[in-house]
Amino acid sequence: MKKIFTLVAAALCSMSMMAKEYTCPLVVNMMGTDMPVGDVKVNVDEQGEGKYTMSLLNFDMNGMMPVGNIVIKDVEATKCGNVTMLNAAKDILITAGDKKDAEGNAQEWMGPSLGNVNILLKGELKGDNFNAYLNIPLAGGIIVGVKLGKNCNEMGQLPNAGFEKFHEASYDNAKSQEPNGWHSFMSSTGSMAGMVSAAVHTYASSEVRENAAEDNKQCVKIVSTPVKAGTLVVASANGTITTGRLKAGSMTASSKDNCSFLDFSSTGVDANGDPFYAVLNNKPDAMKVWVKFKAGDGNKHPKATISALLTNGEYAQDPEDKKHAANIIGRANNSSIESKDEWQEITIPFTYDNKNEMPKAALVTMSTCAVPSGGSKSESNPDVLYVDDVEMVYNADVKKVTMDGEDITNKFDEAGELEIEGYNKNLDINNFQLEAIGAGAYVTKKITADSFNTYVSFTVTSNDLKNCVTRTITFKDYTTGIKNLETLTLPNGVKAIYNTAGQQVTDMQSGQVYIVKYTNGETKKMIKK
């Protein structure tokens, strides 16, 4: 009997670990306008084998539009350091809720009348917090954005990207202000760390640009410092911050032992308790940054630099080491930021070596000089780089649309609509292709019909799910027949996915082998990681 009770207790304990209820602030976004709804309960249940189920019951857009129960099963989970990222592109049926209206009467729920609804989900589990963003297509082509969690807007962005929060970093008796989530030489490692860690390179500054947002009160000020041997100035130490950790490992300034680096396996934390890495399970197209740079006295290389490496979470460093090149998925770099002593916004595009792999982390590094130890040696007039509002940019636009192999991109009107009469072929969703603008954009294709017409619609959704564009082809009085009446969501550039049995599928399961056909004509065999 005791053994039975022990087994029951263990089972109950296991169940409590697998299922968790979160109280999340809910914001509904319609046509670009945020509408706060209040707190709601969300269940996130671990299914096992790296899958979760997310349940948002009785979803009601602030009393204006009762939608119903949104339950998404088989949500893919990716462990990214101290965060579990959730991703899904699923066709689901939204069922009726059971919540009564204000008078205690049963409500009419919209969800069941929508049929299969293709929902895109990005979420994160971090400690006791859950954040998520969902795209839900409703009737009439309306796409509703659902924001869950107090930090939902920070998903897909760097931590403390506006540099509004700082903590005190220290080394021996030296102290400085480091932006939360960012790190200077004061928290560096390496055999030479003792020589550079006492220098103050970062400050919280109120030197924000004009016309900044009302809540933009601070930015980070990064300065170079002189390196001294006794009282003799022998070199310049570039002011540098990174989302990873700085390493001072060599007396030779240009050595790759002097670098920024990240590694999810690292358990170290900074003075604020944050890890020395930034989670980014997204595919941005560019990075926008506001900067103000002034070169100091004696600077013969008056160019500041900002770089970003998107990685798989394993060890990577900047400057790069060829031994770890396979861990890098994408790059962005600007090593020619001019000394203008005024605010300017720069946009740095990302390029991707591995277009099929989704990043897990971002190593972003900013320095007062693009040349190692190449800046000012002045103590009174050093190089100064102000940085504010780093933004990862996610594109959603249309590059090319084809129908039965014909390019019809320029035939759509300004609203993205195209009418066709007299079409007499069977409609096959695979004969309609759209090439999107957006490195990680999602392309959803759908064939629908009413009593009068048949429609082929495309929706391009940015990788962070916050922007989308549509194209719709209306076939007037179409009567020939429809093949493959369905909804299909695929990553940008993918034409179709097949399993080893030759069946077309809409998503891939970890560890399985697939044949992937691309819009550029290539076909590849791959294993889903």
Region locations from a protein language model:
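Bacterial Sec-dependent N-terminal signal peptides
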Residues: M1-T23, G502
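C-terminal outer-membrane/trafficking sorting elements
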Residues: M15, T479-K529
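Edge beta-strand at a domain terminus
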Residues: A19-T23, P36-D39, N69-G81, G127-L158, ...
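Short, solvent-exposed loop/hinge segments that bridge or flank secondary-structure elements
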Residues: T23-Y52, D98-A102, N173-S197
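Predominantly extracellular/secreted and cell-surface proteins with exposed
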Residues: V37-G38, V42-I119
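Extended, low-complexity, turn-rich repeat/linker tracts enriched in Gly/Pro/Ser/Thr and Asp/Glu
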Residues: N62-M64, F293-P302, E314-Q317
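Aromatic (Trp/Tyr/Phe) and Gly/Pro-enriched flexible surface segments
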Residues: G145, G149-P284, P302-N312, Q317-T347, ...
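Beta-rich interaction/scaffold domains
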Residues: N395-G481
